[in-house]
């Protein structure tokens, strides 16, 4: 029995990828907003999804909001990507993560070298 592989046209792949990116950042900002309400944070930077310089401490409320929103975003997006892409969910999830790292580096003008940020992304990938 031969292995059959279907290859989607590039336009379809790019449309699905763009939809996944929009979905990712929408879920990210919604989870940030909910985190701010839950943890009673009255102000949070608009660039919060890209912030890897926040002091990693359980006493730091902003760090808790960022960490929880990151984990919730990846978990929820893992569920939302399934009906959007139907297959190859891991490919899209990893591609969105690579784009997120690139955007983060561009926004913060520095490549994220902090271990807690990478650990959060690594744990998030396991949730997908």
Curated annotation (Swiss-Prot):
Q: Its principal location?
A: membrane
Keyword annotations of the record? Membrane, Transmembrane, Transmembrane helix
Q: Does the keyword Membrane apply?
A: yes
Q: Where in the cell is it found?
A: Membrane
Where do the coiled-coil regions begin and end?
A: none
Q: Can you name a GO cellular component term? A: membrane
Record field: transmembrane: 17-37, 65-85, 93-113
Which InterPro entries does this one have?
A: Integral_membrane_SYS1-rel (IPR019185)
Question: Source organism's superkingdom?
Answer: Eukaryota
Q: How does it sit in the membrane?
A: Multi-pass membrane protein
Q: What is this protein called?
A: Putative transmembrane protein 244
């Amino acid at each position: 029995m031969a292995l059959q592989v279907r290859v989607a046209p590039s336009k379809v792949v790019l449309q699905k990828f763009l939809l996944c990116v929009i979905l990712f950042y929408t879920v990210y900002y919604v989870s940030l907003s909910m985190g701010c309400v839950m943890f009673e944070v009255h102000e949070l930077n608009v660039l919060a999804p890209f912030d890897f310089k926040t002091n990693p401490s359980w006493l730091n409320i902003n760090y808790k909001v960022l960490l929880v929103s990151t984990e919730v975003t990846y978990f929820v997006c893992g569920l939302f990507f399934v009906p959007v892409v139907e297959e190859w969910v891991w490919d899209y999830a990893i591609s969105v993560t690579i784009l997120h790292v690139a955007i983060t580096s561009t926004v913060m003008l520095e490549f994220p070298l902090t271990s807690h940020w990478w650990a959060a992304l690594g744990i998030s990938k396991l949730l997908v």
